[in-house]
Design a protein with these regions (language model features):
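Conserved, well-structured functional cores that handle cations and Mg-NTP chemistry
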Residues: 3, 9-220, 224-246
Length: 246
């Protein structure tokens, strides 16, 4: 019997094919990370950035700094932990610049599958324990399908029938957080971050996308946004068509 790793005469062995695919994926990943790292401002941030991205893709379960450090540098977990913690929590780099670099890299590939058809406004939630993570509160958690302790972010993605790309996101800061000065200070919330409704955040993301000249599509929202008359009127005033899902 011919084993699975022995190919037809003249054809590549399956293990060789897999090895080549893995090498190609690693090369594309390296090129992608290197391209994005130019948006970080300093060359010395490329190493922690690469480790952070590698950990996010290769680590199961919790995506906090501790397991990422253990997965990406098992022989020097403590040092890697400090490096990643500094990169994530203290390094001053622009998320807007990184998002722009992502768009420049990914959007042309998506548009090869067809023109952008939709701008999708959605909530993304992250279940959390405790009360010290920024914005964590008891609220509806989509991941769990019920009210629970979680963080929530408003996101904007461009999409066609081929793929989608997140182009904007903003953490929702509940009023109880926005008005709690000691809690804000302890968590490092910037002074210019104030309470905004999710609808107001979504409108800000739409205005930002228009200012960036991104290819337009129909604004898609769930009923939580679509039932807000002021939100619908504001979207119309921006010159954007919209529809809502149930």
């Amino acid at each position: 019997m011919i084993g699975s790793t022995v190919g037809v005469e003249g054809a590549p062995r399956e293990d060789h094919v897999r090895s080549g695919e893995a090498a190609g994926s690693e090369a594309r990943f390296s090129a992608y990370v290197e391209g994005l790292s130019t948006a970080l401002g300093h060359r010395d941030r490329e190493g922690p950035f690469r480790a952070y991205c590698t950990g996010l893709l290769g680590t199961e379960g919790r995506k906090s700094v501790e397991p990422l450090a253990a997965a990406t540098a098992p022989s020097r977990v403590s040092g890697q932990h400090q490096s990643l913690l500094h990169f994530v929590g203290q390094s001053e780099w622009s998320d807007a610049a990184v998002l722009a670099a992502v768009r420049a890299y990914v959007l042309p590939a998506i548009e090869r599958g067809g023109p952008i058809e939709a701008w999708i406004i959605d909530d993304t939630t992250f279940p959390k324990q405790g009360r010290h993570s920024v914005g964590v509160a008891r609220q509806y958690c989509g991941q769990l399908g019920k009210r629970a302790n979680c963080q929530a972010a408003v996101t904007l993605s461009l999409a066609n029938h081929h793929a989608s790309l997140p182009v904007g996101y903003r953490l929702y800061l509940p009023k109880e957080w926005a008005e709690d000065e000691p809690r804000r200070k302890q968590a490092g919330v910037p002074d210019n971050v104030v309470f905004e409704t999710k609808a107001a955040i979504a409108l800000g993301l739409l205005e930002q996308a228009l200012a960036q000249g991104l290819p337009r599509g129909v604004v898609l929202t769930d009923a939580g946004y679509g039932s807000d008359t002021a939100f619908r009127e504001a979207v119309t005033a921006l010159g954007l068509p919209y529809t809502k899902t149930r």
